[in-house]
Amino acid sequence: MEKSFYTYNEPSFVSAKGNGGQDFSAQEVLVIDGTTSGWLKIISYEGEKWINPNASEVSGVIELALKQLGKPYVFGESGPNSFDCSGFIYYVYKNNGYSISRNSVAGYWPMVIKINDPQPGDLVFLQNTYTPGPSHMGIYLGNGEFIHAGSEQTGVVRGNVFSSYNQKHFLGYGRFKK
């Protein structure tokens, strides 16, 4: 994503080109009205809109994660041919420029910024799945869907955050600082 933001008292100007998203120019934007979880709220002639200045980073995370669909789950592995859930996270984010170390789910949970409004590329954490406390994680894709290294039976698969099993074990959403 190419991005440049120039703000003045009134009006504010934005020029942004998103990956597969909408282009915004200074003529279309009246005011940058604030941010929420890294998204910019802008007021344009067409009404309120949201843009993500980090969309290219997020799309890289999701693109690499989706390329791993169907790969096997192997406990303790962190790619590129097999993964456990935290190894999957490590592989995808590390290969997208995030400075993180290989850790367990319980180790990642205290490192992330806790959020309530997940965006694609954020993390989904589950607890008490096979051990007490934070024990499973995946990458949020949007619309309640996430991708994760599920089990030896499933490998890397898509899942639904709102399934009864995941809701029973849901811990929260998180976001890595880059």
What do the PLM-derived regions correspond to, one by one?
Residues M1, V58-P72:
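Disulfide-bonded cysteine-rich modules in secreted/extracellular proteins
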Residues M1-K41:
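Beta-loop motif signature
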Residues Y6, S15, N19, S56, ...:
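Aromatic- and glycine-rich peptidoglycan recognition patches
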Residues L40-S44, F146:
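SH3/SH3-like beta-barrel fold
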Residues I43-E63:
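Boundary regions of SH3-family modules and the immediately adjacent low-complexity/disordered segments
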Residues Q27, G121-D122:
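Loop/turn positions that initiate beta-strands
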Residues Q68-P120, F170:
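Catalytic cysteine-centered active-site loop
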